[in-house]
């Protein structure tokens, strides 16, 4: 999520810059960050590197509202890392302070905003204070997720896509076999995962932001159909593989990537980002059924989802989109129940708008 009260277009550019890989200058730290720049940190926990796997050494800073931080937290749970990597949760709103400093805030107590926590390491009031402790001249965004090394008091990594992958393997040497053997990127599915994740990230995970932060009718009209083309494609993939997961019987990082966006879709993206050509529960029965299974039957997904944080972040921190900061009550229920194990009984849906179908064919 974005930290600066910029225009919608600048915010969208910042999101894309955070997510997409680009050429970087030579690093000046062991975490691959160029001091004094806007570059991200790219450190990795490995047994033979400067960031070794140790219980309690690292802390993960997240926002329960942010889909990209959500992905890292889901992996943390799936790998049984809750006791190994504690988390600190920032408040979903407001952003910045009265002096103009941007970034997310920590509550002063656990009761100030349920689910958010005071910073236990430095008593910081704002997330940007941690970034400046590592690099006082840092010029980038103060984003979550952020993996912090308490031993060296430095940032390890703040790239969500890298943490999604690295948390799967970095602590295997100190985990019991029950969790060390868990992989979301199995060898026999890597090609398919890489292919799908490319368009899923571009058209769905970040596609909703391109639509929601559009500043012209032309941009909005261009980006919304792209989102639904990706949903149409995902609907068919789930049906073709027979469930219960995106690629069939194997739970993979595609499920994590898709869940973090889909769980927010009917709740936020339909109304707040005007992605309203359809809804998950009414137009995508395969995705909706898949969502029910993950949410109700795989604890790592439900346990990391907080709809109050999600809804209030979007509706109360995007003043240009929702100036009165009113948070809608619905939809209800947030996630429907009654998962159907036999996918042959679940119809395959999708949005039939001609432009959406044309874009889907190109994926």
Question: Which role does the model predict for each range below?
Answer:
Residues 1-363:
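C-terminal alpha-helical interaction module
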